[in-house]
């Protein structure tokens, strides 16, 4: 089973990289861009007896290592 795990900042947390990218895009003439957010993606290939078991294990990975629960949130998208 393969999952894409998206790690992004929670609402209200400053995103200096996203803000700098937005500013640079506007300076390059891309005036219609409203917002740029930084998102990190981990592609995890995991062996498990069920999708539920794999999802529990990946959630534990996120809570223990991949995401900082104080300022980040995560979502899991399964690849078929």
UniProtKB/Swiss-Prot annotation:
Its EC number is 6.3.5.3. Disulfide bonds: none annotated. Keywords: ATP-binding, Cytoplasm, Ligase, Nucleotide-binding, Purine biosynthesis. It holds the Pfam family PurS. Pathway: Purine metabolism; IMP biosynthesis via de novo pathway; 5-amino-1-(5-phospho-D-ribosyl)imidazole from N(2)-formyl-N(1)-(5-phospho-D-ribosyl)glycinamide: step 1/2. GO terms for molecular function: ATP binding; phosphoribosylformylglycinamidine synthase activity. One of its GO terms (biological process) is 'de novo' IMP biosynthetic process. Signal peptide: none annotated. SUPFAM superfamilies: PurS-like. It catalyses: N(2)-formyl-N(1)-(5-phospho-beta-D-ribosyl)glycinamide + L-glutamine + ATP + H2O = 2-formamido-N(1)-(5-O-phospho-beta-D-ribosyl)acetamidine + L-glutamate + ADP + phosphate + H(+). Gene3D superfamilies: Phosphoribosylformylglycinamidine synthase subunit PurS (3.30.1280.10). Its main location: cytoplasm. One of its GO terms (cellular component) is cytoplasm. It is found in: Cytoplasm. Homodimer. Part of the FGAM synthase complex composed of 1 PurL, 1 PurQ and 2 PurS subunits. Part of the phosphoribosylformylglycinamidine synthase complex involved in the purines biosynthetic pathway. Catalyzes the ATP-dependent conversion of formylglycinamide ribonucleotide (FGAR) and glutamine to yield formylglycinamidine ribonucleotide (FGAM) and glutamate. The FGAM synthase complex is composed of three subunits. PurQ produces an ammonia molecule by converting glutamine to glutamate. PurL transfers the ammonia molecule to FGAR to form FGAM in an ATP-dependent manner. Belongs to the PurS family. PANTHER family: PHOSPHORIBOSYLFORMYLGLYCINAMIDINE SYNTHASE SUBUNIT PURS (PTHR34696:SF1). This is Phosphoribosylformylglycinamidine synthase subunit PurS.
């Amino acid at each position: 089973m393969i999952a894409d795990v998206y790690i992004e900042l929670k609402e209200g947390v400053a995103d200096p990289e996203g803000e700098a990218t937005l500013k640079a895009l506007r300076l390059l003439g891309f005036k219609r861009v409203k917002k740029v957010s930084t998102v990190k993606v981990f592609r995890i290939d995991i062996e498990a007896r069920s999708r539920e078991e794999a999802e529990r294990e990946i959630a534990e990975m996120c809570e223990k290592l991949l995401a900082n629960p104080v300022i980040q949130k995560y979502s899991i998208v399964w690849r078929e």
